[in-house]
Amino acid sequence: MKKIFILAFMTVAMLSTSCTGMLDEEVFGRPTSEEMLSNAENVAKVVGQAYAEVNWLHDHWGYWGINTISTDECVVPVRNPGQDWSDDGYWKGFNDHSWTANDVSFEYVWQFSNAGAVLCNKILSQLEPIKASLQEAGLYNRFTAELKVLRCYYYYTLFDAFGRIPYLEDYSSAAVPQSETWQVWNKLVTTLEEEAQYLPIITEQNHSENYGRCSQGMAYTLLARLYLNASSYGVTPSNCGVEGITSEKDFYTRCVACCQKVIDSKSYKIEDNFFSNFFIHNENSKENIFVIVEDGNSAFNYRDVAGKMSNKLRITNLSLNYCFQTCWNTVDKPWNGFCAPEDFLKRYEWGVDHRGPCDKNAGTHGCDGWAWFLGPVYESENSDVILKMEDKGNVPAVIVPKITSLTDATHNDGARFLKYEVDKIGANKYCDNDFVLFRYADVLYMQYEAAYRAGNDSKCSELLADSDFQKIRTRVGCSPYSSLDLDELLNERGREFAWELVRRRDLIRFNKFSMGSWDYKPKAKDNHWDWFPIPRKVIETSGGLWTQNPGYDTDK
């Protein structure tokens, strides 16, 4: 079913903006946009085009990369020094927090997030001439809300990374000054509060037609994140423009309320099987609220950076050892790169918590139903022959948790990521699993944290007694919580949402990102690393309109 929506989104060939410039256009042929929009049946497809830029966000050169590699949940060691994953120290800079404004990933996050927001604004402008007919059909608020909420998500990714960003709500080529972080937060929150009501509540009947698109559940989940993290974004009761917020506690109370709207919708539930959220066919998950729809077998689109930035999901290719191609019949040989730091793995209850590593003695014979791989890579499921890396000195492929060095690791160092089901029949070149952006488990854990911070003991007790809340742990083999403090909640969120784009902001909220220390990353002298630098090229081409974030040397 999910492929239907990919085809709908691919009507971008009829009405499109290019990613290469903020307002540059490529004309692919007829019909024109006006002709398309004259047919009300096509409006939903035209609005669906606005999701085209979302697929660029989960690449390791993009938003997913800068958020994941910069935390304690991921490391990219140089293997076979000077050859594998060196890239002149590029990945090391994210692991040890020594990045600069020249790093190309920042430029690409800036480009694609802005391009997505501009595309939303363009389509909004194209709906205005047919506003009356859409209103008559009862569709205007629905479609404009979808575009505005999706625009919020694009700007949220930009804001979450850089803080001070230009924020446009109309389709214009005019450059605008950067807004301060609290101003951006206010705009996002105000828009989401106003528009969420017009989006569909997901039901069994409308799930398919709204899959991968903005819904009320998606909007309120994003809103809850913004309220929960308000302080970490520099928002205070004094600069907050939202009526009724007079103390920091009010931010948490609003977060609790937004989460409750998602809960009360009855649209979502905690799946019995944790891994069903990440299956190749995960479109039927009742837990996933917002996903990036994937098609692992379609054409490769990329940008010319080292390794080529892609709009295809390659999360297992990034991590698995080379020999998995032989063992599991993957189309391409995996890249033997990204892995888990050993200290991060220690947060799991080994042999109990299935979100953790498999039995290191079983390897590929016993890794099904575990999120991290350790042990030998066998020739096949029924063979006891351990594969060797023939072009790497015939070293047997036996994955170990220890990483010997960030700059001189072995090819076997570091647990490999298995949360997303691997295609073992060679059906697709890229991952066909839809990439999860928002999950219901996050809603429940956010509500608990916000209630705890607000001093709402009754809500915390209510959640601890909730079967869905406790199932998050019991389904993976862990004991339910009888009590839960913030330190344990941070650890639990790390276990539950590994590599799901939440860890960096979690650490910032707990003041443990810049000021924390872990494998290869020392404690910083100040918190300026909580924000990434504005790309140097962006500043240089702004005509003096935009300035660098504090703490970064613009000459580097």
Where are these regions (language model features)?
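An aromatic- and glycine-enriched ligand-binding surface/loop that stacks and positions planar moieties
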Residues: 20-91, 193-194, 198, 213-395
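Bacterial Sec-dependent N-terminal signal peptides
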Residues: 1-29
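C-terminal substrate/ligand-recognition segments
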Residues: 103, 107, 354-468
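Conserved, well-structured interaction surfaces
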Residues: 39-48, 52-58, 62, 82-162, ...
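Short coil/turn linking the two alpha-helices of tandem helical-hairpin repeats
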Residues: 157-161, 166, 203, 229-238, ...
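Long, intrinsically disordered, low-complexity segments
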Residues: 19-20, 113-116, 187-189, 210, ...
